[in-house]
A protein has these predicted regions:
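Acidic catalytic loop of the alpha/beta-hydrolase fold
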Residues: 244-248
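Gly/Ala-rich beta-loop-alpha elbow adjacent to hydrolase catalytic centers
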Residues: 194-198, 202
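Short alpha-helix in the alpha/beta-hydrolase fold that links the catalytic acid
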Residues: 131, 249-259
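Alpha/beta-hydrolase fold nucleophile elbow
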Residues: 185-195
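A conserved short beta-strand
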Residues: 212-222
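C-terminal catalytic histidine-bearing segment of alpha/beta-hydrolase fold enzymes
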Residues: 263-307
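Short beta-strand/loop motif that positions the catalytic acidic residue
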Residues: 239-241
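Serine-hydrolase catalytic machinery in alpha/beta-hydrolase-like enzymes
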Residues: 51-84, 88-184
Length: 307
């Protein structure tokens, strides 16, 4: 048979080159490739919580256009918070390729529990930071993260508060909460609490937390109404509501209780003889008696579950 020595030599060189590439890729590039792939999958799973209740603006956000609701909120008094517990502002990634912030107080000793604190409609102001620190000092060895749901905006007027709450993008709200869940890690057990707009966010965050959810307290926030969404809850709920308000009124509370029962979830509620925002940290005219009773209920509830 006819032989082409030059061809065979070239072929052998190509084989050796391919073997060199394989060896080089296996020993060097493969390690980088695997590491990169691991990071991609880690990022994917970190933000892979099921979508919950942020497809569209809910009843709470729609209240931002109600003049009576707007006037029901007393303007917060000026207050500057200086943390005595080592609280600091932190940043974390969100699944929409942005960053979010929060006021974070780490536990004195390593703890699997983290309490998410959700702002009123004013934003993450210093009153909320003070309340976050109050929970921290009362509950003991629990991490606390007060999440900034307005991306740095803080209202000092009713008009701005209404604009921020009503104009918040539901998809962005969900992304911020998912980012916070990823920030505390997959092994964290998450409790939630919030007032007004934050009360609604507290319930939604517990749904998004899935199996990581450990406890949920909501102060007079508009409840999730879809039973299929409530079925995703992996914790019971303590709801603290105002009997004298016309918005999230006793009828809304009864509907919430019925929906939770249909969903097969535990719920405890208390309707106080008070107006909306009676316990808001930023409310200078808060109802002292109702606030103290609600606080004690919330603390006892958390202590029974975060242990």
């Amino acid at each position: 048979m006819f032989k082409n020595n030059r061809f065979e030599t070239k072929l052998a060189q190509n084989r050796n080159f391919r073997l060199h590439l394989r060896k080089n890729f296996s020993n060097q590039a493969m390690k980088k490739y695997i590491a990169t792939l691991a990071l991609v999958f880690a990022s994917f799973f970190a933000f892979s919580q099921a979508s919950c209740c942020f497809v569209k603006k809910d009843g709470m956000q729609l209240l931002a256009s109600n003049k009576t609701f707007i006037k029901s909120h007393a303007l917060p008094k000026p207050y500057h918070h200086v943390s005595k517990a080592g609280g600091v502002m932190v940043e974390f990634k969100t699944p929409d390729d942005q960053m979010a912030k929060g006021f974070y107080i780490p536990a004195d000793k390593p703890s699997e529990y983290t309490l998410f604190v959700f702002q009123e409609w004013w934003g993450l102001n210093d009153h909320i930071k003070r309340e976050a620190e109050h929970f921290y000092s009362t509950l003991g060895n629990v991490n606390v993260l007060a999440i900034d749901m307005y991306d740095g905006k803080v209202a000092t007027t009713r008009e701005d508060a209404a604009k921020y709450m009503g104009g918040a993008n539901p998809a962005r709200l969900e992304a911020i909460i998912k980012g916070a869940i990823a920030y505390v890690g997959p092994k964290a057990k998450i409790a939630t609490v919030g007032w007004c707009f934050g009360g609604s966010l507290s319930l939604k965050a517990s749904i998004l937390a899935g199996k990581q959810a450990a406890a949920c307290v909501m102060y007079y926030g508009m409840p999730v109404k879809e039973v299929e969404q409530l079925k995703l809850l992996q914790t019971d709920v303590l709801g603290l509501f105002a009997g004298k308000e016309q918005f999230i009124n006793p009828t809304v509370v009864k509907e919430f209780e019925a929906n939770m029962k249909t969903a097969g979830k535990g719920i405890q509620t208390k309707i106080f003889d008070a107006q909306h925002a009676f316990a808001n940290p930023s409310n200078p005219a808060y109802d002292k008696a109702a606030t103290e009773e609600a606080w004690n209920m919330a603390i006892n509830y958390f202590k029974n579950r975060l242990k």
